Every structure is written in structure tokens, then in C-alpha cells.
Amino acid sequence: MVAHLNIHTSFDLLDSSLRIDALIDKAKKEGYRALAITDTNVLYGYPKFYDACIAAHIHPIFGMTIYLTDGLYTIETVVLAKNNQGLKSLYQISSAIMMRNKEEVPIEWLKRYDEHLIIIFKEAELSHKQIIDAFEGKKELYLNHNSNNTLTGKRVWMQSARYLNEDDAETIPALHAIRDNTKLDLIHEKETLDEHFPSIEELQTLNLSEDMITNANEIEELCQAEIAYHQSLLPQFVTPNGETSKDYLWTILIHRLREWELNDKTYFNRLKHEYKIITDMGFEDYFLIVSDLIHFAKTHEVMVGPGRGSSAGSLVSYLLGITTIDPLKYNLLFERFLNPERVTMPDIDIDFEDTRREKVIKYVQDKYGEHHVSGIVTFGHLLARAVARDVGRIMGFDETSLNEISKLIPHKLGITLEEAYQKPEFKAFVHRNHRNERWFEVSKKLEGLPRHTSTHAAGIIINDQPLFKFAPLTTGDTGLLTQWTMTEAERIGLLKIDFLGLRNLSIIHQIILQVKKDLNINIDIEAIPYDDKKVFDLLSNGDTTGIFQLESDGVRSVLKRLQPEHFEDIVAVTSLYRPGPMEEIPTYITRRHNPNQVAYLHPDLEPILKNTYGVIIYQEQIMLIASQVAGFSYGEADILRRAMSKKNRAILESERQHFIDGAKNNGYGEQISKQIFDLILKFADYGFPRAHAVSYSKIAYIMSYLKVHYPHYFYANILSNVIGSEKKTAAMIDEAKHQRISILPPNINQSHWYYKASNKGIYLSLGTIKGIGYQSVKLIIDERQQNGPYRDFFDFSRRIPKRVKNRKLLESLILVGAFDTFGKTRATLLQAIDQVLDLNSDVEQDEMLFDLLTPKQSYEEKEELPDQLLSDYEKEYLGFYISKHPVEKKFEKKQYLGIFQLSNGSHYQPILVQFDHIKQIRTKNGQNMAFVTMNDGRTMMDGVIFPDKFKKFETSISKEQMYIVLGKFEKRNQQMQLIINQLFEVEAYEQTKLSNSKKVILRNVTHLEPQFEHSKVESNEQHALNIYGFDESANKMTMLGQIERQRQNFDLLIQTYSPADIRFI
């Protein structure tokens, strides 16, 4: 016997450690002829198992373990598919089990599908006779070798295999402990296990009967199911009048061509070309299906992106409304998207606004029906950090040890435990004791195994037949899922469309709706001008916070250097700012400003590379060069591009010769042909799809346009989308203030959960206030909308429900200014809280009873709280300052010291800051240093204080104080940071500065005020301080006199003139 009929792979989640690759390797070495995958209830591993078996020339058998019940007794049962019909039966049984969350399978379910299945009962006892008899007369029915001897039936050897070798037995109790969240009793549980994958030699020692061997061979011969890949499973689109999809598609396309007045012959010829390829390849239904769902979205208040990926290169997509990018206008190639030489399903991914994406999915589900639409499964795995903690937990490690493990494993994508072991600290931990060594061994054996299922973020499968006919289904958080991954589902021929949710589309849509509601202006984003100077000024200034694709510090730096003037500049920046092509950015910018420096390897390359100043940026440029120079069809050119990006040496050499031969046939010399090939080879690795770049640059431009022309609405919506992120909110608030947009305190009669734009400024969200949850805000707003604005603080307190009214809520609202609209100081309102909390709640809810039975409420007027305290409360409850930041206030008062802000400071200039975060660490040498986050009231920046500077302040440095810092600016991870060399408390710095000053300069002052007469001194006095007036308009300095160097005179100067107009030098 050379078949194993009962293998549980690692896709039997947390119940097997048998990896398919390792299983097949061992099976091949041992000489196994056939293997059967029999995971319990699920078929997750089928495609991977099938592919691995075929590659190793092993006969794959498809099966499943189920627990069959007659309602009284249950028996472990293995069912195997005889043929492809049996395979479909397994799909349907598994789907039913997973969709109905069944642990046991009723006999009736199996009997419905048993015609094309082999049934093997395991460890059958007399109590199971009724279940076995239910299948009386079925020829392909077996009992396994250790079933009760008194039962009649054909016998076959069948023993579960759940781990590879005998010494892997410990993996099963470990997996079970992880699954059940229990502690691991390794020694006890290992003794009971005997489920390794045996060698052929071990099978031979079992002395199996001839009947068992014959039956096993018989089963192997009977099982001939195969997974059919690349089936034609596209659903048919139902046309309105019963005409063919081809005819219906052509009718729509011609109508749109005329309707949009695209009468140029080039459009018609391009349309005929694309239509022929699409219909020849049988994809007309696909385009109609996608067009239909996008049409639904656009007519049901769901914003759709202009395009995504290479599909924006299709004129058919444009005419159907799938994209809003005219491919001829932007010189985009259809063949980058679809061509006859690359016979794969076209890939149209769609961006929807993220808050309404589910509406479109619901439409598709309703249109195609139950079981016809599903999401796609993904698997979470036991990766290094997770498996290390899981195994540590089940082995009883305390929290300190678990945290130590987490710190010892580097934060690196794809890190393995073996790689972590190369670090001395990790190795020392492993060998600290025997328990840690066992922990490491068990963790390594489990590392990488699938742990749980999840849902693919975007993929949706659609068919006009129930999906369980083609693949097994399961359920996830969002509904039905295929049990197979995206790649596997697509490979069998199922239609997959990515429904992606894009937050920026939601922001754009909300801005459009609010502008219409408040200003009665209809913004048609398809009609905005793409040569708006204000937009390009914004981009050139790098004011791109909140702009899709353009808001990182690195991109802003590029925009400032580039000074974009055309839409094409945006397309280029979004394509270049990625690892790889970034190195071409300086070249691109230099040539953009100096076009005369552009040189082309050959004149024929100029029309293709002119827009990008001789730099190859886009994949389409590679295809155009291959077509122009070597005479490649665009399909051949796309194959060349793909071969270049994959760097397959054998294919590359073949394509190189193909290119050179084609170029020579076109009249190019061999040397220039080689040079051009090498040129495109250099850029092929990171060339970007131009169609995608144009699509996403359009979103970036639209957002920039809205930011320029409707800034209040732009910032309000960006802020609404970062509620919950204190850091992002603070940064956006600071920028809005910098743009001179008023940020208004929360207003109990104006604010909502989201930020609200108004002609006065932007009202803060009630949801921003710490300690006030969504339900409380909802109740406050609902009451206001139903019964009108709140009249005063007492009216508010009476009308809100008792379950949300408490001291914490009222204090929070008062201290952030939500009741300022009523004209009372915050101190007065705080004094009134006790009054409103003492009232009888039942009386409050009845306005008439309230007026009759309660004494007249009155305020005890109090002076307002000090400015600093008000600011502190704002920071405490909001995470940022609404009014001027205390550092900004201090800066305005102390400008006479010649201090700077983070945004305009240079190396070693004094900058006034406060530390928002201080992270103290110990170096390898045992010295303390600190990483800090600095705030100057407008800008936040990270900083470093090294040990030699930090030791002076490590016991006194505080987030409550302000400091003057000096240091060197450096870029780290594309972000500026300050290496702090000197740090002073403000008072100490001021005292030193004033004491050492030699002169004072007064801006735009021509003479000293009379009050300084008594302070004047003769020029030869030792303690004299020279006073100069500086005339800005004339750029002229004039000596105004001298005063005695005394603190009282300094203070008099500061009181008499604006701090901004004084500089002590």
C-alpha cells in the first residue's frame, strides 16, 4: 500500500501542524503514490495541496472529515470524492456545515450527496450500526482498521496524520492550548498521541491484510477528481431587451461616443480596436457587469473614484463610466490593461467612498442573489512575535517574560525566530534555562502555521450561479466568504472585483454636499479647471496636509523644489516619489527647470519622453519605446515589460535578442539598439502605471482645488475624519490656524459629532471632547434638533436625559467653551453645576411642573478663570489649544530676546518650545538620554538630547515648562528633527541674554520716548547700553541714545515698545 487516506493539514486550523510543502517532500522521498487531504469540515487547503501533489507526481485525493450523527450517536467519518461531481458534493457539504455553523452532520445531508463519494467510518462500534445501516447497499463504503470486529464491511487501514515526524507530537497539544486558551500539559498529552505521517517502512511493519491493501488500492483507483483551473465562469449580464451582450455593449459605446461629441476618427478607431479585443476574449459581460454596479453607485449618492490601476487606459471603460479618465487625452495604452498575448482576466478595481461602499455590495447581493456573491477568505498566521507570545503564554510565562520576548524580537516585516536568534540578547534569553529552550523549539515548530481566518479587505466574488458549485464557502464578519484565497478563486475562473473603500472620496463627497447645503453652490468635479493658478500655488508652497498622495513631508519638499505648473507635474510626482525612482527626482526637477539640458539617446525617443524631460517614469513609456524602436505590438511590449520587472535571466536574454532584432529590422544600428534596451531595462524595475498615476493625481487635484476654494469645508471634513487621533487633530488645527481660519470652540447649539464649517470659522466637534462618548453627543444633538436650540445652561441641563447628565459631562462642556454662547464666564457656569445636579430629574422632564415646583435658578457671577488655566483646560479636554497656544503667547511676549520658532529657525538659533512627550532611555554605556516631541505653538517636531547635554536636566526636565533650545536640524525617516545641543529655562536664558547685550535695536522708532530721559547716560560710561532705531523702509540704522544697563530700564523698554519691535543684541 502506497497511499495515505487520512491527512489533516495545517489548514485544519490549530488542530494540525502538518505543512503541505513538508508533507509532499517527505511523501515523495518515501515513494507514496497517493495522498488524501481530509481536514475536518473545511476545504481551505485543496488548491495548495493539489498543486503540490501534481508538481511531485503524487496522486491527490480530495476528502473531508465530518462527524456524522443520527441524533443519538456520532461517528468520525471520512468522505472522499470519486470524481469531479463528488468534488462538488464536498464543496456543498462543507459550505453547508460552515454556513450553518454545524459541528455534526445529519445523515440526511450526506445521503443527499453520497452517490459520488466514498464513505469510510472510523473506529465504528456497535452503537454506530444504525448510522452505517443508513447507507446499506452503497458499494463504496468502508470501515477503518480499528473498527469493531463484529461489524461487517470492507476494511481499510486509516490513521489520522496531524504532524510530520514522531518528535513533532508536542505541536498538537500546543496548538490545542492556543486554540482553547489553556495552559500546556506537554508531557501528559504527548503520551496519548500517535498521529505522525509514517514512512513506508513503518507501514510495512503493520502487517496489513491483503484485503486492506486491496481496498486501499481500490479507493485510490476510484478517486479521480481534479480541480479545474481557468474555467469560463464569467456570469452573463442580463440585457434589457434580450439582445446579446456584444450587441448591447456596442450600442452603448456608439451612443456615448456621439453623446459626448467625441467625433474625432482616432476615438472611433481606438474604440473598434478595444471592442474587438474585449469581445474576442469573451469579456463583454465583465465590462457590462462593472459598468452596471458603478452606474448604480453614481445614481445612489455613492462617490466613485476616477479610476484605479491600468483600467483607466481603456476608452471602453471611459465611455461606460467605469473611469472618468480620457485615455487618448492622457496618452494611455489599452494593452497595459488588456491584450490578446496575455490571456488573463482583466482587472478592474473600483474605489468607492469608504462610508458607502457597503451600499454597492448590498446592490450586487440583491441583484445576483443569495450564495451568488461572497467575500474572500484570508488567513492570519502564527508569525514570529505572535507565536512566541502564544507559546510563552500556554507554557505559563509571566507577563514580564512575555514583554521581554516582545522586546527581543525586532520590529521587522517578515522577521523569523531563527533570524531573531542571531541577536545575542535573544540567544541569551533562549539559553537562560531549559524551559526557555523548550519554548523556543515549540515556537519554531508552530511558526508560520495558519491561525485563523479573516476577510479580504476589498475582493468580492460574483456569479450568476450559486458559488458553492465552484468552490467551498464559509462565513465571516461581513457574510459569505470563499474558503479559497483571492488568487485561488481567480485561478479557477471566478470573477473577482475589488470594491475598495477610499476615505478621500468620502471627504470630497461631504464637502460637495455641505457646500451645496450651506452656500447653494453645485460643485461639478468633472468641470473644474485643471489650470487653476491658486491650486498650483498651494502645491508649490507645499501646503498639502490632507491632500491625497501629497501630504508627506518628503512629497511636500519635492513640490516646493519642483514648483508644479501643470497637471502632468502632479502625475510625475506621485509616480516618482517611491523607493527606486526617487533617485531620479533631482534629475527630473533640474530638467524641468532647465529643459535645454534634456538629451535623448535617439531622436525617436523625444516624442515619448518629452513630457517627463527624458526620464522614463511610466510603464507605458517602456511599451511605447519597444513599439517604436523594435516594432513590437503593444501586447508583445507588455510581455517585455513584465519580463524585465521579474528579472528572469533566461527570458531577459531571449527578449533582449528579440528587441535588438526588431530594432535592426526597423533600421536602428546594433549598438544604439542595445543602449536603448539597457535604458528601458534600468527603469523597468520601478516604472509606474501611468493610467493609475493619472487617476490618483486627479483625486489629489480635486482635493487641492477644494482646499483652495472652500478651505473651511475642507478642514472641517479632514478634521472630522481624524476624530480620535489627538496628534493628527492637533497638527490639522495648527495648520488651519496658520491659514488664518478661525477655529471656534465647541458650541452647544452649533456643533455636531463632526466638525462644522461656517462663515465664522470651524466649530469643533463635540466628539473631540474627552470623556464624552458618541451616544451622549447623539442624545444632545437629537434633543436640539427635535425641540430647538438650548436657551441657556439651565435649559440644557433640564432637557438632556438623566442617564447622560453628570458632573464630568457638564464640566467638560463648560471648560472647552461649549456654553460660551450664553454670555456667562466659564467660572460662573462651573459654580452652577451643583444647582442643576440637585434638581429632581422627573420634575425636570416636565416643563410645566419644572416651572411650578422648582425655585428660580440664577447664576452666581464669577470672574473668568486666568488665561493660562483656561488654556490648560482646553489642552486637557481636547488635546490641543483652541485659543493661542501658551508657547505662542510666550513667544509673542519674549520676541525681544531674538528667539525663533521651529518652522523658521535655523541651525543653533534659539527656539522657544514646550515638550509634549519626553521618552528617557539608557544607552549601552549606561548613560541617560531622551527623545522628545517639541511644540512651538504651531509646529511639532521630534528632538534628541544626547547624554552629555541631558545629564544637567534629567532630574528637572518637564512637560509643564517652556525652554529655549539650540541645536542642529537633521532629516530622519523623511522627517526633520532637532539634535539639541543646548537647553535653557526661559528665565535663565533671558537673564543671561539681557546681561550680555551690547545694544538694543528698535524697529521703526526715530527717537526715545520722554520716560527714558532720566535713564540716559554719557557715552563713556561703562554700563551704557546703546539704543538704535531701524527704519525698515530706508533700511537705515540710527543711534538714538544710551541708557543705563539696569533691569528696570530693560523692563521699561519692553513695556513701552512692542516686543516684536525690540531686539537685544
Curated annotation (Swiss-Prot):
Q: Which Gene3D superfamilies match?
A: 1.10.150.870, Bacterial DNA polymerase III alpha subunit, thumb domain, Metal-dependent hydrolases
Q: What is its main location?
A: cytoplasm
Q: What class of enzyme is it?
A: transferase
Domain of life assignment? Bacteria
* Catalysis performed (reactions): DNA(n) + a 2'-deoxyribonucleoside 5'-triphosphate = DNA(n+1) + diphosphate
Q: Which Pfam families match?
A: DNA_pol3_alpha, DNA_pol3_finger, HHH_6, PHP, tRNA_anti-codon
Q: Name one GO biological process term.
A: DNA replication
Q: Where in the cell is it found?
A: Cytoplasm
Q: Does the keyword Transferase apply?
A: yes
TM helices/strands, residue ranges:
none
Which Gene Ontology terms cover its molecular function? 3'-5' exonuclease activity; DNA-directed DNA polymerase activity; nucleic acid binding
**GO CC entries:** cytoplasm
> Which keywords does this chain's UniProt record carry?
Cytoplasm, DNA replication, DNA-directed DNA polymerase, Nucleotidyltransferase, Transferase
EC number of this enzyme: 2.7.7.7
Q: Does the keyword Disulfide bond apply?
A: no
Similarity field: Belongs to the DNA polymerase type-C family. DnaE subfamily.
Q: How does it assemble?
A: DNA polymerase III contains a core (composed of alpha, epsilon and theta chains) that associates with a tau subunit. This core dimerizes to form the PolIII' complex. PolIII' associates with the gamma complex (composed of gamma, delta, delta', psi and chi chains) and with the beta chain to form the complete DNA polymerase III complex.
Query: Could you tell me what this protein does?
Result: DNA polymerase III is a complex, multichain enzyme responsible for most of the replicative synthesis in bacteria. This DNA polymerase also exhibits 3' to 5' exonuclease activity. The alpha chain is the DNA polymerase.
What PANTHER family does its record include? Answer: DNA POLYMERASE III SUBUNIT ALPHA
This protein is called DNA polymerase III subunit alpha
Gene that this polypeptide is encoded by: dnaE
